[in-house]
Amino acid sequence: MRVQVSPPALTHSISRGGPNFGVGKHIIIELENCPFRVLDDLHTIEHTLLEVVKVLKVHLLHSYFHKFAPQGVSGCIIIEESHISVHTWPELGYAAIDVFTCGLVDPSSVVEFLKKELCAKRVSSKLLVRGPGEIK
């Protein structure tokens, strides 16, 4: 399959963020003690992750969400600036969310939003600088 990159996507480069920025930022978010009904609801998870796109002011390209039986939801949103993914384990009250953004977008701004929307009692996150070389 041949993929063409649109001109706006070409603005995402190492030089935009400086030498300590890499090509982007990737935040890993662990949400715990969330209600089963929230994490098992496809509509709630999809709506919440699409709201993250708005909060970050990034550009949606594609999204796909899947409801598992007997429980759980996974989804991925492809944004011009990279991606957002989610996997839920309602039986554990746990959701794993990754937000990877290129350019100057700061993905850490969505942590509290996700905690509130998914009714998490506990949240932890780790921000990684992505790019060539060692993980920082």
List the predicted regions and their residue ranges.
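Polybasic/polar functional segments that serve as interface/processing modules
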Residues: 1-136
